A protein has these predicted regions:
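Cell wall/extracellular polymer interaction/catalysis modules
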Residues: 1-123, 127-131
Length: 131
């Protein structure tokens, strides 16, 4: 399964984008500009996260020898106090803020989980618009 995050609005603090799977728009994304994952290709694995107390989609960088801090796809409404590289999912409200985050996250989690149980690899590609 190929997941694509395209960042289209990058400001001093906020970074907004869209998430699509195999070319179909799924939801919007928000990240903190200073702590966002680097542009590139990642493998998504489900790992236990102590902060959430459950398995969450975690990004593993595959196209660079330089290690980056592991980021996760997460539930949330805003990125202003997040300094851990989380990418939150939902419906765009204003720059850096999303609404209705739980349902898109649950759908994405289920798709990733089902794909991995079938033995398929889940890949994520992050791109940015030139600004």
């Amino acid at each position: 399964m190929q997941i694509h995050i395209h960042r289209h609005r990058i400001r001093e603090i906020t970074c907004d984008g869209t998430l699509s799977i195999d070319g179909q728009h799924i939801c919007d994304t928000a990240e903190h500009s200073q702590y966002r994952p680097l542009v590139g290709n990642y493998r998504i694995v489900l790992r236990h996260n102590r902060a959430y107390g459950r398995k969450v989609p975690t990004l593993e960088r595959i196209d660079s020898a330089k290690p980056s801090k592991p980021a996760v796809l997460a539930i949330g409404n805003g990125i202003y106090n997040r300094h851990d590289g989380r990418i939150i999912l939902g419906t765009y409200l204003i720059p850096g803020c999303l609404k209705w985050s739980r349902e898109p996250f649950k759908q994405l989690y289920d798709r990733i989980n089902n794909s991995q149980r079938r033995g398929n690899e889940v890949m994520l590609r992050i791109t940015e618009s030139r600004q």
